[in-house]
Amino acid sequence: MAIVNVNRFLKEVESTDLKIDAISSSELYKDATFFKPDVLNCIKRFESNVKVSSRSGDGLVLSDFKLLDDTEIDSIRKKSNKYKYLHYGVILVGIKAMLPNFRGMEGRVIVYDGACLDPKRGHICSYLFKFESDCCYFGLRPEHCLSTTDANLAKRFRFRVDFDCPQYEQDTELFALDIGVAYRCVNSARFLETKTGDSGWASQAISGCEALKFNEEIKMAILDRRSPLFLEEGAPNVHIEKRLFRGDKVRRSRSISAKRGPNSRVQEKRGFRSLSARIERFGKNEFGRRASASEAPPGRSISMEDSHRPGKGTSDGSSP
């Protein structure tokens, strides 16, 4: 099941304020039509825009990253007395290279359930991205719903992103990462079919991406939830689009800077292996396709909330 028409998406995505706006609501839900403004108004959109800076030539790793911020989670929980379930119509991931000679560079994105203690069962999907143009995209449409009253709702979709980083001066912004989501709250799964009648799991490599199977390397990456990049979040952005005969279209986004933090050197001494080390060991043509338990470092399962508490000079990328 294809989530988007690739040619139409690639044409639209560069002309929208948010990447997630390149996917229309009518593509996600069959009842999202012009004649049902209430349905269109209940489909919410949120996007995180992350600028990733270099770390003195080391490989870059962004781990345990939240799909939604606290403001969005609070808004969903306030609707729990009216709606029982939360459904993600689509999650869109875009990676943009902002450096010369980017063609052939690659990396990996792992999406997983941060509340699941079993990495294999909690693994949602993984993609290898390789720059043939300056942007790579993939999308996924989960089959399952989540509870609006789930105490661990913020943990249910987490991301780990590994970048192959060339040698640059520290804090040079090299990559832009856009993670957007369109979702709705419902009381019945019968409202979740697309306009083609599909309601099952879907994952699509839109441009420059290739799906990866779960393996030992991905397992160890999920277990190692330390983030050597310091996340610095700016003020949230509200995007309002005026519409005739219907309510205004309101979307939220957040801008985040990911760079080397004050504790990065300490984390490296604890055994963190950069992406550059993995690529050198396995070879670029094997990245993400091969795993060796004997070569993988012991994983530590710690949450961003524990390692980034106030007073330690870190942030988890969500609103205060």
From Swiss-Prot:
| Family under the similarity heading | Belongs to the tobamoviruses movement protein family.
What name does the UniProt record give this protein?
Answer: Probable movement protein
Provenance organism: Apple stem grooving virus (strain P-209)
Q: What is its EC number?
A: 3.4.21.-
Q: Which top-level enzyme class is recorded in the Swiss-Prot or TrEMBL entry?
A: hydrolase
Q: What does this protein do?
A: May play a role in virus cell to cell movement by increasing the size exclusion limit of plasmodesmata and forming a complex with viral RNA to assist its movement. May also have a papain-like protease activity and cleave the genome polyprotein.
Taxonomic classification: Viruses, Riboviria, Orthornavirae, Kitrinoviricota, Alsuviricetes
Q: Name one GO biological process term.
A: proteolysis
Under the heading InterPro entries, the entry gives: Trichovirus_mp (IPR001815), Viral_movement (IPR028919)
